């Protein structure tokens, strides 16, 4: 199966196939894309927050007496960067973990070496709603000072009549995480529920079939609490 044709990413036609491919795509995105801390700090560094504990610079003894609370105010712009760390040739952990979906990873690596995430569209999907099924991870392990200034979105919806872009999906992935700069203490596991609904949209005066997805996301909250 070829996943990327032109600027379109194809994840299948049946619900179980889309679910499986979407799960692996999310694992890939959380592994390969990270929020750009320095650029995010330029945008949100001035925001006032009740705490500025940073697990990198502060005494880790605070881990057991502090509880993380994100900013209640909605945030907006997110800036991320592409790490491209997965090595399917030499790293045995990557080879074993991604074996089932190796071709998808390889096609994404080739595409992203030449084009941007804003150009790649997920074929047929015009609406995606991600729901964080596990809520805020209050453990401060891995928390940065910026996390206190950013908003936790318990759910986030993308709507794009021209099909959602990989860029929009990446932003949604970060919006629904409470620990936005690390994946060790808040790790994407799977979808607890995944529903695909058929829809019809008008394009060039013609009816075109499309899909809308609602996915309930399972995050593993690792902590010593």
From Swiss-Prot:
Superkingdom of the organism of origin: Viruses
Assigned protein family: Belongs to the mimivirus L31/R44 family.
The name this protein goes by in its record: Uncharacterized protein L31
Originating organism: Acanthamoeba polyphaga mimivirus
